[in-house]
Structures are given as structure tokens and as C-alpha cells.
Amino acid sequence: MAVRRDTICALASGPPPSAISVIRVSGPDTRSIIRSCLSVETLRPRHAHLVDIVASDGALIDTGLATYMAEPASYTGEDTLEISIHGGRIVTELTLKSLMENGARLAEPGEFTRRAFEAGKLDLTRAEAIADLIEAETEAQHKQALEQMDGAIEALDSN
């Protein structure tokens, strides 16, 4: 029996303030969230769209770029939305609040990658390599993580 997943959201970029905040949404309610939180009814998959991001009461939060990836052609294998907005603290907080008020919950650390692994989008070696790449602090660590990712890709291609 398949388990129905909930929809998750999280800041995918560095913490504000910054020039841009990137927020990711993934799960079964993504299309509903697009209709509720953005100034459009639908988004063409894999294209960037200039949209208004709105609060639950319809108030404008920001204008940004939104990209929708339809399942299964996304990182997690689920419907996924990425929103690039101005990277101020309040803009980021209000955007996350609107997403959560419209059906998403805040993702746990690593949850997007866990979902990708569970969907067969990547193997454990590649998932670990992604974590190593994110955590790399030296050029040697960076190089090792990239080599680990290349090895994981080659192993997947040979199957």
C-alpha cells in the first residue's frame, strides 16, 4: 500500500539577509500551493515565470521567479516548485508562512534528498556525495565529493 506523503517546503539557499532566497516545495499539494500562493493558476514545467508571491489574505509579499518541475521529472520525483525571491528576512519568513498556511510543512534537514533516494532518483553513494559537497570546506574535500558523485553516476549508468 502506497503511503500518501505530505508537502514540504524549506529555504534551499543560505540564510537571509542575502540578495536572493530560494525556497523549495515538494509533494502532492504543490500545484494547489501554486494556485494559492502565486499570481498564476499554473506554471509551464521547467520554465522560469515572473510571479507575485501572495499571503493567505492576498497581500503581496514579493515578486520573484518560480519554476515548476512536474513529477516524476524532478529531484524528489514529486511535483516540485522552486521560488527565487528577494533575500530579506521578512520576505523569506512571509513566503514560508504563506506556503505553510496553504498546505506545506517545514522540511526536516535532508528530507528532499531522502525523498529523492526513496523515489530511486539517486543511490546512497550519490546522496552521501551530495551531503559531502554541501559540507566541503576545502578544495580537497570539494574534489573528493565531486569524484564520489561521478562514481555514483557511472555506477547508475552501468546498471
What are these regions (language model features)?
Residues M1-K143, E147, G151-E154:
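A glycine-rich (often HGG/GG-containing) alpha/beta subdomain
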